[in-house]
Amino acid sequence: INPNMIVAGGGSAGGHLAAACGNIEGLDNPKENLKISSVPNALVLLNPVIDNGPNAFGYRRFKDRYTEISPIHNISKGAPPTLILIGTKDKIIPVSTVKNYQTNMKTVGSRCELVLYKDVGHAFFAKPPLKYFIETTLEIDLFLNSLSFITGSPTINKQYQY
């Protein structure tokens, strides 16, 4: 395992966990070997919960402590390159939130690619038709290839028979 090619990813709450690992400092267990970073080298986030602030997902649960666990409120220089995939009709994660996240990432000099899928909602990639699973898999492949984490042409394409 190449420790310089660790990718964290997830959808929805899993995307929150991955983004937290990449952006929030101080989550290490004091008993672990702190010489080994637990910060991933890249993030792949599908309709991620990245804002836990007022009027956002999870705020009622965390209230004033949201800044401790809200990825969008913890972006800093050195944040890992990130790919975000989301539907334009997501009723849980507003597109404006992921656009703000992308802006914040660019402000600190970190790469953040955003791919919008027209007229689909939350978790669109995990529901029929299979075309969205294929399309998101292709985008992830291209992103990881652009980072040289994988090489070669994608083995899947948008014309895949599903």
Predicted regions and their residues:
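Short beta-strand/loop motif that positions the catalytic acidic residue
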Residues: 78, 83-86, 90
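Primarily recognizes the serine-hydrolase "nucleophile elbow" in alpha/beta-hydrolase
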Residues: 1-62, 66-67, 71
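Conserved serine/cysteine hydrolase catalytic core
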Residues: 71-79
